[in-house]
Amino acid sequence: MPATELADCFQEPEGSSAESGDVAFGSGLHQVPGGDEFRAKSVMSWHYYFPLFLYDTEKYVWWQRDLAHNVFGPTVFGGADKELKKIGGGQFLTEFGICLPGSSRPDYWGTQECEWVMQRADQHGLSWCYWDTSDLGVLWNSEGNAVNTAVDILSRPYPMSVPGTQLRYSFDKNTKIFKLEFQSIEDISTPGKIYLPSNIYGENRYFKHSEDLEVRLSDEDSQLLDITVKKDSVTTTNSWLVVGVTSELPSIRSNNWLDTFLSFIPFLSR
């Protein structure tokens, strides 16, 4: 353990108290292992499960869905953000599951729960991992083949890397429109990578972007878009990209914070 012993990470700093709520909730850490110099190299791993699942039901009970998606879920995701503001580092939703997604059952509670978690993860800029085992057989059947009805739900577009910071992105499963916005950094020469799953886009990959970007299909993988910031580009707004399955694509109006907020309203999960 460099610089700081692990036990030191759990010690309460002077002046802290139980009134802050840090004692009862959160990770219990007051700094990342290794101390402040390791903030940029640390990632908090956490899991998400709604505790009141009713496994024998087909559809959500209305109060259960409201509790999960309007109270419990937002509190957990927001709590993880607050924890990161306190101790620093990044975060990774390394496990969620129990919900069994299926494109042939859109009203099934498992499908709706998985879609909600992924949409919420997008809002918070989170990578995620769905938990499956050989006994569950959610993603792979007994013959080792992919379960396509699950793939249809769990496979989504996402930014693998971006030449900038402060990224925001969203995906609308109905229109199949993916939106990305970020503050570009011209000095980054390596192209960013956007993953566009073939089960959603196939050969119908249309995109529109801000003038400061160069966007092209990747030579290494037909499911990837390469994003590069143009040299000597001048922009007073955020860089943006929109991808869809038709040529009729909206723009992200990045002239001010209000326009940016309004452009994302249709894709916010309430």
Predicted regions and their residues:
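C-terminal catalytic-base region of ester-bond hydrolases, centering on the histidine
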Residues: 44, 61-66, 87, 99-100, ...
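Short, low-complexity, polar/charged sequence segments that are solvent-exposed and flexible
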Residues: 62-67, 147-150, 200-201
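Extracellular glycoside hydrolase catalytic/binding regions
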Residues: 1-118, 122
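C-terminal beta-sandwich/jelly-roll accessory domains of carbohydrate-active enzymes
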Residues: 169-270
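Extended, alpha-helix-rich binding/interface surfaces that flank or overlap catalytic cores
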Residues: 110-195, 204
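Short Gly/Pro-enriched loop/turn and capping motifs at secondary-structure junctions
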Residues: 97-101, 135, 187, 200-201
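Generic short alpha-helical hydrophobic face used as a protein-protein interaction/packing hotspot
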Residues: 48, 132, 209-211
